[in-house]
C-alpha cells in the first residue's frame, strides 16, 4: 500500500518545457552524429589518398637499361655519355624536367639539371653524332639533354616519360669532369626523379679503348 501511495504522489514531467528539452537533446544527438559521419568520411578519403601516394612512391621510378660512351682519340678518353632510361613497371608518369643527374668520378660529385629535349635521336644512326644531333651543344658542365628513343604518345616532347617510353640522357663528360674519362676509371651515380626510385649508374671503363662507341653498363 505504501508503494502505491508513493507512486500516486509522483507526477510525470509534462508541459512545453519538457518538450523543448527533449527536442534539444534530439538535435544535439543529430549534430553529433553528423559530425562523426563527416569526420569518418574525411578520414577515409585522407587514408585513401595517402595510400595512393604511398603506392605511387613505391611503384614509381626509373631504371637504367644501358650506358654507352664515345671515345675521342684526341682527348684520350670518353668525352660523351649516353644513359638510357625507362620507367619502372607500374610507374606513374615522371616529369624529367624536375629530375637531377648525380655523377661521381675521381673523388668529385657533380649535379646536372635538365636542359632540353631533342627528337633528333629518333632513328639516329649514331647517337653521338653532334652534327646530326645539334642539341649536343646544350649538354654542358651543369646540364643534360633528354633524347627521345621510343615515345608512342609524344609525352617526352614535354619532358614527361611514362609507360613504354625510352629516353637517353646526353651527357658531355668532358665538360662535366673537365677532362675525358680515361681507361680503368670508375664512374657512379643516379638519375633521381622528383618522386620514386632513381636509375642507378655504375660502371668501370675498360682497360683499353678499341672502338669509338663503347658499351659501359
From Swiss-Prot:
Q: Does the keyword Nucleus apply?
A: no
Any single GO BP term: archaeal or bacterial-type flagellum-dependent cell motility
Intracellular or extracellular location(s): Archaeal flagellum
Q: Which Pfam families does the UniProt entry name for this protein?
A: Arch_flagellin
Keywords attached to this entry = Archaeal flagellum
| TM stretches of this protein | none
Which residue ranges make up the pro-region? 1-12
**Which molecular function terms from Gene Ontology are attached?**
structural molecule activity
A single GO CC term, please?
archaeal-type flagellum
Question: What is stated as this protein's family in its record?
Answer: Belongs to the archaeal flagellin family.
Write down what this protein is called.
Flagellin B1
> What lineage is this protein's organism placed in?
Archaea, Methanobacteriati, Methanobacteriota, Methanomada group, Methanococci
Amino acid at each position: 500500500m505504501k508503494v502505491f501511495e508513493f507512486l500516486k504522489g509522483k507526477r510525470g514531467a509534462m508541459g512545453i518545457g519538457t518538450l523543448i528539452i527533449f527536442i534539444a537533446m534530439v538535435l544535439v544527438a543529430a549534430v553529433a552524429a553528423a559530425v562523426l559521419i563527416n569526420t569518418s568520411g574525411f578520414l577515409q578519403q585522407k587514408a585513401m589518398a595517402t595510400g595512393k601516394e604511398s603506392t605511387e612512391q613505391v611503384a614509381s621510378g626509373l631504371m637504367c637499361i644501358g650506358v654507352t660512351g664515345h671515345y675521342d682519340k684526341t682527348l684520350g678518353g670518353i668525352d660523351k655519355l649516353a644513359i638510357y632510361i625507362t620507367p619502372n613497371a607500374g610507374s606513374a608518369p615522371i616529369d624529367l624536367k624536375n629530375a637531377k643527374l648525380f655523377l661521381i668520378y675521381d673523388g668529385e660529385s657533380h649535379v646536372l639539371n635538365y636542359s632540353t629535349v631533342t627528337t633528333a635521336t629518333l632513328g639516329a644512326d649514331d647517337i653521338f653524332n653532334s652534327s646530326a644531333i645539334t642539341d649536343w651543344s646544350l649538354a654542358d658542365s651543369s646540364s643534360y639533354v633528354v633524347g627521345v628513343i621510343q615515345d608512342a604518345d609524344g609525352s617526352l616532347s614535354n619532358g614527361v616519360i611514362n609507360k613504354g617510353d625510352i629516353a637517353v640522357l646526353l651527357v658531355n663528360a668532358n665538360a662535366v669532369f673537365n677532362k675525358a674519362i680515361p681507361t680503368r676509371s670508375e664512374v657512379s651515380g643516379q638519375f633521381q626523379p622528383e618522386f620514386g626510385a632513381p636509375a642507378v649508374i655504375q660502371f668501370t671503363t675498360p682497360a683499353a679503348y678499341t672502338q669509338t662507341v663503347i658499351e659501359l653498363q
